[in-house]
Curated annotation (Swiss-Prot):
Superkingdom to which the source organism belongs: Bacteria
Organism: Mastigocladus laminosus
Main location (coarse class): membrane
Lineage: Bacteria, Bacillati, Cyanobacteriota, Cyanophyceae, Nostocales
Keyword S-adenosyl-L-methionine: no
GO CC field: photosystem I; plasma membrane-derived thylakoid membrane
Alphabetical UniProt keywords: Membrane, Photosynthesis, Photosystem I, Thylakoid, Transmembrane, Transmembrane helix
UniProt key word Lyase: no
Protein's name in the database: Photosystem I reaction center subunit PsaK
Spans through the membrane: 14-34, 53-73
Length: 86
């Protein structure tokens, strides 16, 4: 009884498309821009091989901003899917 109720409430799975990839890339760019303006010491910690290529970020700042970008992108993608935009 409970299993059939849960299955009836489940949504259709989201299929990957280039639009999903573009949204994730845009969310990561927004997160990196946000991190660039708000991280107090962006070059702290171990340096990256070509720090100017990564905007002067150290490894911790780069990992933090891209992790935040993926969390933000996942929320945007799932939110748009929930609204029926995908």
């Amino acid at each position: 009884m409970l299993t059939s109720t849960l299955l009836a409430a489940a949504t259709t799975p989201l299929q990957w498309s280039p639009t999903v990839g573009i949204i994730m890339i845009l969310c990561n760019i927004v997160a990196i821009a946000f991190g660039k303006s708000t991280i107090q010491y962006p070059n702290a910690g171990p340096a990256l091989p070509s720090s100017q290529f990564f905007g002067g970020f150290g490894l911790p700042a780069l990992l933090a901003t891209t992790a935040f970008g993926h969390i933000l992108g996942t929320g945007v993608i799932l939110g748009l899917h929930n609204l029926g935009r995908f």
